[in-house]
């Protein structure tokens, strides 16, 4: 879900293939290549295999080159806010709705690093990153179109012929098409996200890292705001009435139109990026053992071996390339064997094996970071899955499969939830500027702990608001189905307040990891890859367990949110007691999120 949000995009949380600050996060090749940042030892080899001179991309081109981030994030915001409610209108029970999110963390963990390695070695005349960005964006367009028209396609394939305004049963053909499109969308998001970040790293000069990261995050924020605004609008069916069909009523046509707008916006952003991102094609002799984007290590043994190998020269942006230069004629003879080994090491299975086996080489203090990170995401992901559904059910007392008034109330609640996510994104953007000074003032450990305590309070507040809302509704103080104004406004405040701890979650853990591994000589990449494991495993657990857990207590979203508050409380306590104390000279490691 980048994914991510934010953020949000997982969108599984998408792990960047290369941090924009080399001093903080040194990413090493999957094959155990040399760390980036080494100086060339052979001037002749540098001249032969590296580009002739360093260059600096203008700020204008950097802004335009990473515009695709806004297009991807637009679709991710719609996915995050609308698709859990929509799948329930197709007849998938609330207890099973969370299962559709399984693909996001899996593809984020396996596909994204592999795509990063493959793009490193891509020899297309159009560059290393742009072919993957193009392919991923086209996949996104196809996937969201499939999702938007799933009800119509199901109708064509044999679902009920009864009008959607009166039919309350299941539409399994439409649901199958929806799930296929949803999983393809997760796969496509992860295909684009990494090469887009790597492209930005390729284009930015040594002194442009901070500004480049800020530009990328700004585009993500723009995409979030536009996407959640689109999801909050209930007028798409009025502006595009031809999208309403016998199988697709108001809520469906609103979603369909929003996704079609997302397609147009993404194609525009992608075209701008592809045009202004001037890549230098990779020569065949340069394609060996590049390490721009692989967040993995083979282990300390490979690091020791790699330290004795020569390194070649500068990349176009002034950074040094970590690919190895043959030191003698024997190296050339071994090229074919090495490439055969790399084909195996670049595979999805090898990615998982490398990360799992490399956990033995984690630096001291990382295990407590992983534990706190896992509990943090066990508390966050139920909210990401069911936030708008909670607003529609518990606050507005709607039902996606109820009578006409109940469905209308549910749709209104979902749109109000999307507006709450819009407010959340605004606060998240503001909070991202406050994280650095807060960490310098109080220390990263305490800031991370406070963010988890804030999530605990907010998740507990959702349970309390649900109880108050149900009590008011049951006491018949309302003669029509809908939300109490005070409860609704309080819910929007909770959505907004969660933006600040979310900005901390998207940045501080990665900076703590960078600080703990700063002197390990390449261990940063290993630790960051394992940190991603502490994100995706909780997402898989929640995807599998949240729906059945809610069903165990009679349905609704309160059980999952209440359990999330327990996890966040535990994460806060462990952060205070177990996290290593770090100096207050905090340095941001960049923005990480769903999108």
Curated annotation (Swiss-Prot):
Residue ranges of the TM segments: 62-82, 98-118, 131-151, 174-194, 214-234, 257-277, 366-386, 418-438, 448-468, 492-512, 526-546, 557-577
InterPro entries: MFS_trans_sf
Pathway(s) annotated for this protein in UniProt: Glycan biosynthesis; sucrose metabolism
Family to which the UniProt record says this protein belongs: Belongs to the glycoside-pentoside-hexuronide (GPH) cation symporter transporter (TC 2.A.2.4) family.
Cytoplasmic-side positions: 1-61, 119-130, 195-213, 278-365, 439-447, 513-525, 578-595
A cellular component annotation (GO) from this entry: membrane
Subcellular location, record wording: Cell membrane
Positions of the UniProt region annotated as Disordered: 29-55, 291-340
Gene Ontology MF, one: sucrose:proton symporter activity
A biological process from GO: sucrose metabolic process
The keyword Cell membrane is assigned to this record: yes
CDD domains: MFS_SLC45_SUC (cd17313)
Glycosylation sites: 403, 484
Keyword entries, A-Z: Cell membrane, Glycoprotein, Membrane, Sugar transport, Symport, Transmembrane, Transmembrane helix, Transport
Function text: Responsible for the transport of sucrose into the cell, with the concomitant uptake of protons (symport system). May also transport other glucosides.
Keyword Oxidoreductase recorded: no
Gene3D superfamilies: MFS general substrate transporter like domains (1.20.1250.20)
Pfam families: MFS_2
Assembly with partners or alone: Homodimer.
UniProt membrane topology term: Multi-pass membrane protein
Name of the molecule in the record: Sucrose transport protein SUT4
Sequence ranges on the Extracellular membrane side: 83-97, 152-173, 235-256, 387-417, 469-491, 547-556
